[in-house]
Amino acid sequence: VKARIPFAGILLPAFLAAASLHSQALPGGSEIQVAASATYQVAPAIASDAAGTVYTVVWQKQIADGWDIYARQYTPSGGTLAAGPEFRVNTLTAGCQQLPAVAADFNGNFVVVWQSDQDPGGGTGVYARRYNRAGTALDAAEFRVHATAAGNQARPAVAVAPDGRFLVVWQSDQPGGSQGWDILAQAYNAGGTTAGVETLVNSLTAGAQSSPRAAYLSAPTAGFAVVWESAGAVLTRRLGITGATLDAADRQVNTTATGFQRSPAVAADPSGNYAIVWESWGADGSTSRVLGRRFQGVSPLNATDLTIDASVAATQQRNPAVSSDTLGNWLVSWDSLGDDPSGAGLVARQIDNRQNPVGAKVVLNNTLTAGDQTLSGLTLTQGSRLLAVWQSLTPAADSAVIEARSGTLAGGDFYTVQPCRLLDTRNPSGPLGGPALSSGSQRVFPVVAQSLCGIPATAKALSVNVTAVGAAAVGSVNLYPGDGPALGTVVVNFSPSRSTIADNAHVLLSRDGSGNLAALATITGGGQVHLILDVNGYYQ
């Protein structure tokens, strides 16, 4: 595995061979090795805190009688990644522990999940273990996730809320389920206790439901988006923070009707919008391509599937991964035949928060190109910094390595400013002053045009503290770009008994050149509320 500081991503292994893990920054920077031995090191995954101050990489490592799950942490230090020691995650060492996944909360505390063939039920089981940001285990041993005892529980994924609550999803061939597999979920409190009961995610029970993925959705949903493949289509359903279903039924993601759709991935931004990507086979007469779609709640933000990279004759675009930054931009990576001098290579492409591709695709593996580079994964942190890791098969050496590369998304640079009060409706009437917000009435603030607090005309988003005061009833304030809430909304709830401060909220500004910010208050029974914004940084 190799890494570079502003860009993050992960790959899962397609081949089993003697492996080492490396990481490399983008552009430039030396590669670092995550793990190396004479045994196989495969199936890496990665997670980070919101600020990008600690990255956690997990993978499966071959041992004498099977596989173990290992982890290692990295902290940015002077433009490089400082590595901590690798450590084994599982305490049960018999048999095979495989297919790890990892996710972290706002501060970098993380949860690892994996599949084990040592389940007491006789089939495969799903297990988890929690750690703090320093890599200290919070559980004495792994715990069994599933309540279902019969059948096989496999291919787990995990999503973690900023406050540490988390959801584990997996596929299950429980007796009496669908024809093959169902998608199950279990929610947990931050302390590791179950929240709610084991949930059947899919409402469609005909055919096999498989390959689930999940992402945390912030307010107004305050829950999770789960995606999976089903009989040649990609489906999604939202769950609440305790795992209860929020949508009446599954929703089909893809509008492409020909061929079959598979291998979905999902990522959400801080506004609760979420991007889903997948591979599409046979729709255009060639082998495969990568498609995507973005949603706000249940509403799609692009009416039809977005072609992220159409395949060319006799090539394949496979196994997409996706991550989203604080501005709602998303980065997609995937395996590609034809973009690498030898075999499969890894490429990536940025999509902005209006669902427009930004520039051309970029080849990630520019150092090691021999053999096949496959199965990537991504994580984006504050300032649109990212880290990508993947597996590489080198036939001549009969080995597989894990590599990584880092960089920064276009328009994602973050700049701090001295904390400054930008807007206060308690002040006399003015562009950034009074009057107070009235319930149900939108107000647009020209925050850039006033040239205050060191915010330049080129700013695309602000990092702010939000305070709502003076309301006579409970309610909320929605903050969104001046040219439309569909681009991303921050929701701040308040009550008469206390003001509400949303620390380090990231609010998007309008993209029409005006740099405006809109606010809409909703108050029970009507009335008014005052809004205060203190800015501490901006993106451009």
Regions found by a protein language model. Give the residues of each.
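Bacterial N-terminal signal peptides
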Residues: 8-20
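N-terminal secretory signal peptides that target proteins for export/translocation
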Residues: 1-4
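Short edge beta-strands and adjacent beta->alpha junctions
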Residues: 409-540
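Extracellular, repeat-based ectodomains that mediate carbohydrate processing or recognition
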Residues: 24-410
